[in-house]
Amino acid sequence: MKRDVLSITDLSREEIYELLESAADLKKKRKAGEPTEYLKHKSLGMIFEKSSTRTRVSFEVAMSDFGGHALYLNSRDIQVGRGETIEDTARTLSGYLHGIMARVMSHDTVEKLARFSTIPVINALSDREHPCQILGDFMTIMEYKNRFEGLKFAWIGDGNNVCNSALLGSAIMGMEFVIACPEGYEPGAEFLEKAKALGGKFSITDDPKTAAKDADIIYTDVWVSMGDEAEQEKRLKDFGSFQVNTELLGVAKPDVIVMHCLPARRGLEITDEVMDGPNSVIFEEAENRLHAQKALILKLMR
């Protein structure tokens, strides 16, 4: 039966644990050089409306490791921008491919792709959520903390799409989620209501130190996301006191892990000292995108 993952809430707690176990096994096999050609003769179409280093490379490598093929499709390669509907594109690609991964400007696009395709669709980033990132993040948290329940997850910065998925994912997995952001940059009410319905324990503050106090995880992201460039001057001013630096780490637990979905703007949302410091797990986190996405691809396309 066709299955799509457009939101982290499309997965249950049990399924997330299963995916993380599968990801750990796939990571171990890759390090050992063991063959994992589980998707021979299968093809994944990768639709990119937004460019990305990590997303493209990790999905292409994943399909290569599985003995399959990944096909890169940007706005110049498909006809959506020249009059063909998303619905017709979804139906057409379903006849060629075994799965679709989409990194899009609007969440409505990935929802339409899922609705009208007969093959699995993965949201690899939309303006609303980024479930693939959070699966990689959760794999990293599991490696370093070996649990979720009872951990304090401090989000420092913009209540953006990654924050939305982290908020919902934390609610599913039983972590306390504290968001520190300037007024007006909170996650949307819809996501806060969803987190509440999931039984999530969360709060919002405009004081980074309140959020970071006794935190097990400190997470940040760029202050100016792709598409927000027109607001750059205002955002840099508004987020000026929300930098993740050694002073902020000083109020967290000594073994706090620092995370960032990348790309980072060093010297803005995070300092070099923290990003390259002993508490940073940022590059392990980036690698784990590959393994977590491999587990997800396998679950949906095998």
UniProtKB/Swiss-Prot annotation:
InterPro entries: Asp/Orn_carbamoyltranf_P-bd (IPR006132), Asp/Orn_carbamoylTrfase (IPR006130), Asp/Orn_carbamoylTrfase_sf (IPR036901), Asp_carbamoyltransf_Asp/Orn-bd (IPR006131), Orn/put_carbamltrans (IPR002292), OTCase_ArgI (IPR024904). It catalyses: carbamoyl phosphate + L-ornithine = L-citrulline + phosphate + H(+). Its main location: cytoplasm. Pathway: Amino-acid biosynthesis; L-arginine biosynthesis; L-arginine from L-ornithine and carbamoyl phosphate: step 1/3. It comes from the Archaea. NCBIfam families: orni_carb_tr (TIGR00658), PRK00779.1 (NF001986). This is Ornithine carbamoyltransferase. It comes from Methanosarcina mazei (strain ATCC BAA-159 / DSM 3647 / Goe1 / Go1 / JCM 11833 / OCM 88). The lineage of its organism: Archaea, Methanobacteriati, Methanobacteriota, Stenosarchaea group, Methanomicrobia. The gene is argF.
